[in-house]
Amino acid sequence: MSRFSEEQFIGFVLGVLSSICLKRGRNRVLIVDSTDVSLDLNWFRKKITKADLAGKEFKWGYSSSKGYYIGYKLTLAIEYPSLRPVAFLLHQGSPGDAKIYEEILEELKRRRIARNGDTIILDKGYYGYRNYVLGISRFKVISVIFPRKNFKMGKLMAMLSYPLSIFNRSNPEREKEFYRGLVKSLKAKLENWEEYKPIRSMIEDIFKLAKSAFSLKNLHRYTERSVKKFVCLHVLLVGIVVSLGINSKEELQRIAEW
């Protein structure tokens, strides 16, 4: 593994997963979520401050389920209903989901994973009117970000005007029709967002599988390069499991608890 760069290794793993799983269809659904990747530094025995981590490749982070930890934040994208992992990002510490939303979509587009018209399901951590708008206007995808209590549909619809780039295209009317279709679909899906909660919850079972069955819970790796490669291996193992047809909530939980 040491002979390959992180980018080469990630490309290799995602290429393997693509070859062993079913080919994608049109307008597919992706689920995106994040989890902590904790490094085993025994910080309970010896107090470690932020100053102690200056110059290190890992940072203090916070997870609502785990509390404070030292390590990274793993953001994973999986295809639904196959649950095949298709991309991941690793960040030091625990940056806010809404702040890295744009970077996530850039990565999905760069790797040609998210295509025009695809639907991406995300939890409330990614919430923000700007993020809904970016999904359609820049990335041409439908970002079903679970709304918060103060969400106003009218406010969002008022923000979704045609991007100026549409009028520079060879067929602006066709582009406008496609844009209207994205907006209409986003509105319908946000009005019924609770129907997507069981779908989004499947990625939690994927994380549980990776942590409990494949030991992603605590890594004995202390450089970002090494952590990325080992996360790649965990993603590959998860992909192999779901490629065997093990992709129901009950089956995934059974393996994770085995």
Task: Enumerate the language-model features and the residues they cover.
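Short hydrophobic/aromatic-enriched beta-strand-loop microsegments
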Residues: 139-147
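Polybasic low-complexity intrinsically disordered regions
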Residues: 2-124, 129-137
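Short amphipathic alpha-helical "interface-anchor" segments enriched in bulky aromatics
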Residues: 163-224
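Short, charged, surface-exposed secondary-structure boundary motifs
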Residues: 99, 152-160
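Nucleic-acid-interacting cores, centered on viral/eukaryotic replication and modification enzymes
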Residues: 199, 244, 258
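Short helix-capping/linker segments at secondary-structure and domain boundaries
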Residues: 216, 238-252
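Short, acidic/turn-prone active-site loops that include or flank metal/cofactor-
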Residues: 91-96, 146-152
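Membrane-interface transmembrane-helix boundary segments in multi-pass integral membrane proteins
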Residues: 221-235
